[in-house]
Amino acid sequence: MSSYRCPVCEYVYDESKGAPREGFPAGTPWDAVPDDWCCPDCGVREKLDFEPMPATAGSES
């Protein structure tokens, strides 16, 4: 699974964890998150501004 980071506040959306408080349960793929979804921490960035994070050693893809 992949992770995506907000370039302003460093919030990370991790597909394996989802964002339950935003209505996205664990396992929700990034493609299923609406394009107009904003960062839940800073609220100023839309999904298209999030940056994919490189896979780390030991992570499952």
Curated annotation (Swiss-Prot):
Cofactor note: Binds 1 Fe(3+) ion per subunit.
Residue span, Rubredoxin-like domain: 1-53
GO BP annotations listed: alkane catabolic process
Functional description taken from the UniProt entry: Involved in the hydrocarbon hydroxylating system, which transfers electrons from NADH to rubredoxin reductase and then through rubredoxin to alkane 1 monooxygenase.
Pfam families with a match to the protein in the record: Rubredoxin (PF00301)
Gene that this sequence comes from: rubA3
Gene3D superfamilies, alphabetized: 2.20.28.10
Molecular function GO terms recorded: electron transfer activity; iron ion binding
InterPro entries: Rubredoxin-like_dom (IPR024934), Rubredoxin_dom (IPR024935), Rubredoxin_ET (IPR050526), Rubredoxin_Fe_BS (IPR018527)
Keywords for the protein's UniProt record, in alphabetical order: Electron transport, Iron, Metal-binding, Transport
Annotated positions binding Fe cation: C6, C9, C39, C42
Name recorded for this polypeptide: Rubredoxin 3
Transmembrane segments: none
Protein family: Belongs to the rubredoxin family.
Source organism, top-level taxon: Bacteria
CC cofactor: Fe(3+)
Organism in which the protein naturally occurs: Rhodococcus erythropolis (Arthrobacter picolinophilus)
